[in-house]
Design a protein with these regions (language model features):
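A cross-family signal for N-terminal binding/gating loops and helix N-caps
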Residues: 2-212
Length: 212
């Protein structure tokens, strides 16, 4: 399934956005199943504790560090962000996260028995969001925005993806199909039956040219 938003109708009349390969800090393959976790904002503190229970490698310990604090501790307490930085440093020091040697794009597919969707993983720039080249697709609240800003500053990394929709291009689809024929970096099946598969594009140049 290709994701297309209503904003796609005037895509070609809007300023071109920049989308680049990047040097990823990603899960070591042998630990990927333990590290994989739901997005921080779809589980509450109690649920995140259940995910992280007896699993020191659960990434919610980085993305939702308030799980390690008493319920009376506000999620935006400075100590919570310090804990995020500590856990992120631990994940790197233990070798649970590894740094790629060069910039690349990645293909991410999510699927179950009834549906599937794909996305190319890369980096965009904040100035494109500010200029309107990237259109907002929802109204967000100030408090959660401030929380993620502080979290990003604390760990000096993006702990989760920002999802963008675009009209699509058959040339990009062909490159994605080619990548899917290769060996994936990760193939994880969650208890709910959803399969998460990620491939590394062996060459970034063709995609970089198409994305501009």
């Amino acid at each position: 399934m290709e994701i297309v938003s209503a904003a796609a109708r005037d895509y070609h009349t809007r300023p071109d956005m920049k989308f680049h390969p990047f040097i990823a800090l990603r899960a070591a393959p042998e630990f990927a199943g333990a590290i994989a976790a739901p997005p921080y904002d779809v589980v509450d503190r109690a649920e995140s504790r259940q995910w992280a229970e007896r699993n020191p490698r659960c990434f919610l310990r980085v993305s939702r560090p308030d799980l390690e604090f008493p319920d009376a501790t506000p999620p935006d307490d400075p100590a919570v962000y310090r804990r995020a930085a500590e856990r992120f440093a631990q994940f790197r020091a233990e070798g649970w996260l590894i740094r790629d040697t060069g910039p690349a794009f990645y293909l991410y597919r999510i699927a179950d028995a009834a549906w599937e969707q794909r996305g190319v993983v890369g980096v965009c720039v904040v100035s494109d969001y500010e200029s309107g080249a990237i259109r907002r697709h929802e109204k967000t609240r100030a408090a959660p925005e401030a929380d993620r800003i502080r979290h990003t500053e604390a760990i000096n990394a993006n702990a989760g993806p920002v999802l963008l929709a675009w009209p699509g291009d058959p040339r990009v689809a062909a490159l994605c199909a080619e990548a899917e024929r290769g060996e994936p970096l990760y193939a994880i099946r969650r208890p709910d039956g959803v399969r998460h598969t990620i491939w590394h594009f062996s060459r970034s140049e063709p995609l970089a040219e198409l994305f501009g």
